[in-house]
Swiss-Prot record:
Belongs to the universal ribosomal protein uS2 family. This is Small ribosomal subunit protein uS2. GO terms for molecular function: structural constituent of ribosome. InterPro entries: Ribosomal_uS2 (IPR001865), Ribosomal_uS2_bac/mit/plastid (IPR005706), Ribosomal_uS2_CS (IPR018130), Ribosomal_uS2_flav_dom_sf (IPR023591).
């Protein structure tokens, strides 16, 4: 199990919230105090709540659920794409298109077009078009890749949403809520925690803080996925053994 320590949180600056004048009163239970006009997040609560979020993600992955990582602000983009890919999951780190979840069937059509354009580039069939047509198609492909590249392999709605800064990603959170998709999020002192199922109180602006928490969530997906694979393998071996044993019994009975 990937634990998170107070030392790691402090070194990454997870405890630094927003200026006291820019806060959401609903975050009061997660605030330790203020220093130099900045709210300080109660890291003891972060450790406890992160553990709950981590266990939830492990269980979700073990059940075969997928996760969509969402973080479109500049500080989050690299961590979101790299950690999502490391655990074999999906991500949105450029721009959230309205309806990405609630109108997924339409978004899927754009994903399919992106896949077709990728295939044309890969097998060279794009060269059969005029130079002008090929350039336009490549331009379209790059535009689609930028917004949809991270969900190219997502054939159905995700089981869990992991969000960095729900205030910035309020449309994504709203869509998940409408569809009953659980949301795990890094929630800073200026955010509304009410729509978040698993609140991780923390700094959602510092790159190191985002990287630390995102990598730990990716670890949870990996842990759950590995446990699922072991169980599936054990179940398969058990079924094969049972079938073999049944065959031996039948053979023995026949000889008798």
């Amino acid at each position: 199990m990937s634990n998170i320590t107070m030392k790691e949180l402090l070194e990454a600056g997870v405890h630094f919230g927003h200026q006291t004048k820019r806060w959401n009163p609903k975050m009061k239970p997660y605030i330790f105090g203020a220093r130099n006009g900045i709210y300080i997040i109660d890291l003891q609560k972060t450790v406890r709540l992160f553990k709950g979020a981590y266990n939830f993600v492990v269980d979700a992955a073990q059940s075969g659920e997928t996760m969509l990582f969402v973080g479109t602000k500049k500080q989050a983009q690299d961590s979101v794409s790299e950690e999502a890919q490391r655990c074999g999951m999906f991500y949105v780190n450029d721009r959230w298109l309205g309806g990405m979840l609630t109108n997924f069937s339409t978004v899927k059509q754009s994903i399919d077009r992106l896949k077709r354009l990728d295939a044309m580039v890969a097998d060279g069939t794009i060269e059969a078009y005029t130079k002008k047509e090929a350039l336009q198609m490549e331009k379209d492909r790059q535009k689609l890749e930028k917004t949809l590249g991270g969900i190219k392999g997502m054939n159905k709605l995700p089981g869990v949403l992991f969000v960095i800064d729900p205030k910035n990603e309020e449309i994504a959170v709203s869509e998940a809520k409408k569809l009953g998709i659980p949301v795990v999020a890094i929630v800073d002192t200026n955010c509304d925690p009410d729509d978040i199922d698993y609140v991780i109180p923390g700094n959602d602006d510092a790159i190191r803080a985002i990287r630390l928490l995102t990598s730990k969530v990716a670890d949870a997906m990996i842990e759950g996925g590995q446990a699922r694979n072991i169980k599936l393998q054990t179940d398969t071996e058990g079924a094969e053994f049972a079938a073999e044993a049944e065959g031996v019994v039948e053979e023995t009975a026949g000889e008798a």
